[in-house]
Amino acid sequence: MSKTHLTEKKFSDFALHPKVIEALDNKGFSNCTPIQALTLPFTVEGRDVAGQAQTGTGKTLAFLASAFHYLLTHPAAEERQTNQPRALIMAPTRELAVQIYSDAEDLAQATGLKMGLAYGGDGYDKQLKILESGVDILIGTTGRLIDYTKQGHINLNAVQVVVLDEADRMYDLGFIKDIRWLFRRMPPVNERMNLLFSATLSYRVRELAFEQMNHAEYIEVEPLQKTGHRIREELFYPSNEEKMRLLQTLLEEEWPDRCIIFANTKHRCEDIWAHLAADGHRVGLLTGDVAQKKRLRILEEFSNGNIDILVATDVAARGLHIPLVTHVFNYDLPDDCEDYVHRIGRTGRAGESGHSISLACEEYALNLPAIEDYIQHSIPVSKYNSQALLKDLPAPKRRYRSRSGNHQRRNNLSHRNNTPRNNRKRSG
């Protein structure tokens, strides 16, 4: 984590429980990020917080440290039952729930508090077995949480802390009715600590905070600009016919250590994956059609560096903390202006620099004016030489073949044209 991302405030400056401080110190966390420095003064006193902060700002650690501190300093009621979690953390996606759980493991080990996961699509009985043994902190998605609650496997009457992460995304995905259903099964708002975090504190998010929080403190951490001042943005205008070759040429020139390529549909993502896999890239595919176990494995391989390129729909654009992403490619300009910000926010995180490259093709170029109006600046345009694009590229890989990214990067470029690398660079 870059030092420029941190404040002068230290975790030890706050009255956090010693076990929380010890766990943070063991992981090398001493100084707070801005969102952490603003959140902790309120949460150590048990006060509610509604925070606005983009992903990559340290908000996960802010609410985890707050939740663990609260549970350690507020003992559970003597009549609490085994199936009653003390803290509930709700996330919009399975991947984000798993990420939060992973981030919390060191705190759980240091404090002795037990955790459980509840998300759909996989592991119903495995998750249930852990819950039946009793957990202090339950992290999950709303659908599976409601399922377990209706079946009587969990009871929310003893919840002392509730966290709603990515609240705006919850609205986008239509989960707000589920959230309200779960809130109605918990103790009254003044008998629990309530934390809400969102990339935007829109009217509808504030309305939810008013309903379900006890005089929440509103805190905001805004980047210097919506797209982040450490992200270098770049825009190309390819024809539909040259779009794929331009992408592959840019990948050849940039040779990113770790990049995400976003497209607007799963079919387009599959097509991109097929071309890159055939060209020898270590590439993974992340769409809604990919089985849950495989999705988690692909994310793990990407985070560990076994995959260099992740091709994804917007299912992966929000909430996931994937470190050291150097490049983001918008193969398609998104239809939603906010998605542009969330996509390129995968890079340039935690004080690091990043590079965003967007392709404004004939199909999606009409989305550009609204995006530039939303981010309040024009995206710098670069030109390219059509004659310098890579030629003789292999045919896309058949879709039934593995998409897991096990193919090694190419060791030779004998199938390329013979143009020297420096002469193939874009102009402009």
Curated annotation (Swiss-Prot):
This enzyme's EC code(s): 3.6.4.13
Claim: Hydrolase is one of the keywords in the record: yes
Region (Disordered): 392-428
InterPro entries, A to Z: DEAD/DEAH_box_helicase_dom (IPR011545), DEAD_box_RNA_helicase (IPR050079), Helicase_ATP-bd (IPR014001), Helicase_C-like (IPR001650), P-loop_NTPase (IPR027417), RNA-helicase_DEAD-box_CS (IPR000629), RNA_helicase_ATP-dep_RhlB (IPR023554), RNA_helicase_DEAD_Q_motif (IPR014014)
Name of a matching Pfam family: Helicase_C
Compositionally biased region (Basic residues): 396-413
Annotated ranges, domain Helicase C-terminal: 245-390
GO biological process, alphabetically ordered: RNA catabolic process
Sequence motif DEAD box, location on chain: 165-168
Family matches, as SMART domains: DEXDc, HELICc
Positions contributing to ATP binding: A53, Q54, T55, G56, T57, G58, K59, T60
GO MF annotations, alphabetized: ATP binding; ATP hydrolysis activity; RNA binding; RNA helicase activity
The family this protein is said to belong to: Belongs to the DEAD box helicase family. RhlB subfamily.
Record's subunit section: Component of the RNA degradosome, which is a multiprotein complex involved in RNA processing and mRNA degradation.
Protein name: ATP-dependent RNA helicase RhlB
Species, as recorded: Photorhabdus laumondii subsp. laumondii (strain DSM 15139 / CIP 105565 / TT01)
Gene: rhlB
